[in-house]
Amino acid sequence: MGDNKNNGDSGKLLYCSFCGKSQHEVRKLIAGPSVYVCDECVELCNDIIREEIKEISPKRDSDKLPTPHELRAHLDDYVIGQDRAKKVLSVAVYNHYKRLKNASPKDGIELGKSNILLIGPTGSGKTLLAETLARSLNVPFTMADATTLTEAGYVGEDVENIIQKLLQKCDYDVEKAQRGIVYIDEIDKISRKSDNPSITRDVSGEGVQQALLKLIEGTVAAVPPQGGRKHPQQEFLQVDTSKILFICGGAFAGLEKVIEQRAHVGSGIGFGAQVKGEKEKATISETLTQVEPGDLVKYGLIPEFIGRLPVVATLTELDEEALVQILSQPKNALTKQYSALFEMEGVELEFREDALKAIAHKAMSRKTGARGLRSIVESILLDTMYDIPSVDGVVKAVVDESVVKGESAPILIYEHNEAQAVSGEQ
């Protein structure tokens, strides 16, 4: 291999066979049989190949678009329950990508963009549904928190930063980013602070809704390359957001009261008021299914913003039975994840049925939905995961109801069939 020094024996100056530069003009010269190539030409060839791959890959990705049934089946593998929401999402996502695939409208009919609004309590699976869809379609996915966004010119995150994050996920490939999915969480937190427009500017509420309007509907956003700060001399990447699918989600706490007032159900005041008991709590989810655009306006979203989210799907609160299923049934269920961790140590991990029910019951009492399951399982297994790498001969660990309740430690079974509780104090 040559480098940027003279050829030792002959003192002959070497040149790149492609660009003609001498070994003194380049960093490295690679030698072949009577041929030399410099590092600059190698890099140029790499760039040409990368560009060709970029041109081919979008076509290859879009060859086969999964049907709504196939999308739903993929969601079923990872998300428990929420059947209605899965169906709504599958159809909306299928129609969106069908619109992109058939970009040239027939008979002058231009297909409108159908962004999605997900309404459901914390831990009901809103984020997981969006993530799973993106994975199923093999498209870039990014998440944004609406509470961190502010209008341009104010302290906080600019809405265009959302597109920047999406570009980062696909290595600043604009074509790929334009086929991506953006999930904006906590969208209910940017509702207007009061029904009446105020003289003081609401930069984190209505102001953010206004800023998001064009982005969600479709505009060409100018984004600085590689995350640089904007300055006049810089060339921007032009991203067409009309091709990006936006999914907005929020808990919308108290929205059911707005719906009930409209429907004149349970709106009594004083001694004659209807009070919901424990058994009637499930009706809140049922009430949310009756949501109309006017209810969302009253809640604090501006009409123009609601108009950009024509597809609305409501998610129900997960019950104890659903949480038990979430722990064990999906492809990436928590019990399967922790079993895989234990397998790396050569140990089998077993969760008994009563343990799963106890974990689900604890999560229900914390009112965190499926989101709280991981922290419970982590705390149960902490001492065991701490001890096992230092203990020889362990083949199995068993978790039962008493472990979840904190009454005992997980049982360790050794090679010689000896059962012993982990002390957790080693």
Curated annotation (Swiss-Prot):
Keywords: ATP-binding, Chaperone, Metal-binding, Nucleotide-binding, Zinc. One of its GO terms (cellular component) is HslUV protease complex. Pfam families: AAA_2, ClpB_D2-small, zf-C4_ClpX. CDD domains: RecA-like_ClpX. PROSITE patterns: CLPX_ZB. Zn(2+) binds at residues 16, 19, 38, 41. One of its GO terms (biological process) is proteolysis involved in protein catabolic process. SMART domains: AAA, ClpB_D2-small, zf-C4_ClpX. Gene3D superfamilies: 1.10.8.60, ClpX chaperone, C4-type zinc finger domain, P-loop containing nucleotide triphosphate hydrolases. Residues 4-57 form the ClpX-type ZB domain. ATP-dependent specificity component of the Clp protease. It directs the protease to specific substrates. Can perform chaperone functions in the absence of ClpP. Component of the ClpX-ClpP complex. Forms a hexameric ring that, in the presence of ATP, binds to fourteen ClpP subunits assembled into a disk-like structure with a central cavity, resembling the structure of eukaryotic proteasomes. Belongs to the ClpX chaperone family. This is ATP-dependent Clp protease ATP-binding subunit ClpX. It comes from Shewanella baltica (strain OS185).
